[in-house]
């Protein structure tokens, strides 16, 4: 069974979502592909537990982070935050991490879901999954008109406007979402 990984609009560094053209593609870029709330951290390891220090990081326990840049490769990769003892520290499991202060230019950020951008144009994307054994199904998103988001799935795509074997007819495959709000929209 896959674990649930989620993000919320109230997290520090989370992208804002509004009726501004491109806001939805920026949100998906952050959550699916790039991550967000990047911080430079220092890490010390004791007994298989890493304690990271980053000023006002805003991270939340049990959320996934991506650690990069540690000279000890055992510390790098996606991990789950174990505890948040203070606004400047958090801990995570560090099996294989040698006791002591980690070397390197180390960064942390909310881990992306592991998708990539197969095709891109201004405020249009074709996203695909990157895990081994995946199929070539893609998510297509068009946020070129304010307050309207077109999205749909397909077996593959050769460009942002060229779908191969879309799921259903265009009427069923492309969904249009329109909202008349002017303030940022809360999201999970």
What annotation goes with each model-predicted range?
Residues 47-55:
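Surface-exposed ligand/attachment interfaces on beta-rich extracellular proteins
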Residues 4-8, 14, 29-48, 71-188:
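Small/polar beta-strand repeat architecture
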């Amino acid at each position: 069974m896959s674990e649930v990984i989620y993000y919320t609009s109230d997290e520090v560094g989370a992208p804002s979502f509004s009726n501004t053209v491109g806001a939805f593609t920026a949100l998906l870029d952050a959550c699916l592909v790039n991550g967000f709330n990047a911080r430079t951290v220092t890490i010390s390891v004791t007994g298989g537990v890493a304690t990271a220090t980053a000023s006002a990081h805003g991270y939340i326990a049990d959320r996934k982070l991506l650690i990069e840049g540690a000279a000890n490769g055992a510390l790098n990769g996606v991990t789950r935050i174990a505890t948040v003892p203070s606004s400047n520290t958090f801990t995570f499991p560090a099996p294989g991490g040698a006791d002591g202060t980690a070397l390197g230019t180390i960064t942390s950020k909310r881990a992306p879901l592991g998708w990539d951008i197969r095709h891109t144009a201004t405020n249009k994307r074709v996203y695909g999954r990157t895990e081994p054994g995946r199929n070539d199904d893609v998510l297509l998103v068009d946020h070129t008109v304010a307050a309207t988001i077109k999205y749909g799935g397909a077996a593959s795509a050769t460009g942002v406007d060229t779908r191969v074997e879309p799921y259903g007819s265009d009427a069923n495959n492309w969904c249009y979402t329109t909202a008349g709000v002017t303030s940022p929209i809360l999201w999970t």
